[in-house]
């Protein structure tokens, strides 16, 4: 019986391999302005607005995040500061992997080439990939594809 061996193994990066820390940063920036129930609602809206921003025509991820932060702040009657939106974008390259990711990825990479398909910008992703602790055959970004995942049309 033949054994199936994939040519590549593909991964998303943010949230799957890299610990996606948007909520932590939102709490850091806005937590003092609201109680916990309101914060949970803020975080839910922020996630929804980020998703909504990627479903349309492609735009740079910095715009996606700034627009999502601005929309969330407006919904919660919190003043929006552009520098806060930019802080989310600038934080992304500093995020590292989930604790169990590097060892597992290294084992797989020894046998099968790894590929990332990410909703990232070209300038951001190298820092995140470097922190994963395994070699990647290819890394493809939303910027290169001129589209975000999921693409519904």
Regions found by a protein language model. Name each.
Residues 83-94, 101-130, 140-142:
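Substrate-recognition element of Asp-dependent hydrolases with the DxDx(T/V) motif
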Residues 4, 110, 134:
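Structured loop/turn residues at beta-strand edges in well-structured enzyme cores
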Residues 23-26, 129-133, 153:
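Short, glycine/charged-enriched secondary-structure capping and boundary segments
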Residues 28-29, 71-72, 107, 131, ...:
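Alpha-helical structural signal in soluble globular domains
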Residues 2-99, 121-123:
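N-terminal helical cap/lid subdomain that shapes the substrate entry/recognition surface
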